[in-house]
Amino acid sequence: MKEHLFQAVEAQRTTLTAMADSIFDDPELGFQEFHAQKKLTDYLTQSGFQVETGTGGVETAFRAEFRNGQGGPRIGLLCEYDALEDLGHACGHHMQGPAI
């Protein structure tokens, strides 16, 4: 199982790195992360997730759900993709979404 997971991540390395770099190159402050949201949600949609934007009344928030059959465990993940004013992504938030 572990090796399968590593192979799956490795197969996406170029795409995920490019996504993180794109978000890094276009830092957006909190509640203004339209570019980052689009990058992340486009990837998730293409990967078979059902994506809902504007979650919780926050225009740049989103919720993505992947269904794999009925029942079973549920896993929740959270990522931040906002930048710091005058510092950009010194916080590393540009990597959270692609890493998850």
Task: Specify the residue positions occupied by each region the protein language model found.
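Acidic/His- and Gly-rich active-site-bordering loop/insert found
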Residues: 2-100
